[in-house]
C-alpha cells in the first residue's frame, strides 16, 4: 500500500473551502482512493455533502455528552458517506468560550489512538483559515498534514488570508515536512481573477493547482446536501472537480516552502493589476467629485 497522504484545505471563511474540498474528495474516491475527512472548522460543515445529511455530531459535542473523549468509541464519531468516505467533525466550543482549535487537537489525537488512520490512502483536514492560531495550525504544526492547499479567489480578503496561511506554513516548514501544495482559485468573477491567482501563486513560490469556474449547479447540489460529483456526475462542473482531484493526486512530493509577501507588496500587486487604486488616485478622484458638487451651476 502506498504511503498515507495527509493533505489539508485551508481558506478564509465563506470562500467555498468545504464545498471545494468535498467535491474534490468525492472525485478522488472515484479514482479508487480510500479517504478519511477530518473537519477542523467550528461550523462542522466539512462532511455534510459526503454524508447527504445535516452537520454530523462533533467529537467535542459527543465528548461533552459522554463525559470525556476517553468515554467515546471510534464508531461514535466516525460516519461513512459517499462511496465509503469516512467522516469526522472535530467541532468547537460555544462562541466566545475557549479555543476552537483545541477541538482539532483533541480529535486528531483521539483518531490516531483509535486506528482511524488505518487502511486509508488519504487523510484530508478541512481547516478554517482566517486565523492560523495554534489550534488551527495543529495539522501543520504537528507535521500531520504534509500538503496544504489554499482555497482563495480574486477578492482582497481571500488573497490576504492566502498570504497569511503561507506565513503559517513557512513557520513550520523547516521544523517538519509540511509544504504548500498549491492554490485553488474558486472563481468569484472579480476583475483579472485568473491572472491575479497565478501571480500570487508565483510570488508565494507555488502554483495555481486549478481554477474552479463559478457554476450554479454547485448551489443546486448543495441544496440537496450532495456534491456535484454525486448530483450531476456528467456535468461540466463535475469534470472540473475531477481535473482538480487528478492534479492533487499527481502532486505528491511536489509541494514547496512558501515565500509569503508583505501587506505592502500585496497592495502593490493589486495596484499593478489595476484592482486597487493608489491613495493619490483616490484623493484626486475625491477632490474632483467634491469640486463638481460645489461648482456653481
Curated annotation (Swiss-Prot):
MF term (GO), any: ATP binding
SUPFAM superfamilies given in the database record: P-loop containing nucleoside triphosphate hydrolases
A family per Pfam: Fer4_NifH
PANTHER family registered for this protein in UniProt: LIGHT-INDEPENDENT PROTOCHLOROPHYLLIDE REDUCTASE IRON-SULFUR ATP-BINDING PROTEIN
Superkingdom of source: Bacteria
GO process terms (BP): nitrogen fixation
UniProt-recorded name of the protein: Nitrogenase iron protein
Record note on modification: The reversible ADP-ribosylation of Arg-102 inactivates the nitrogenase reductase and regulates nitrogenase activity.
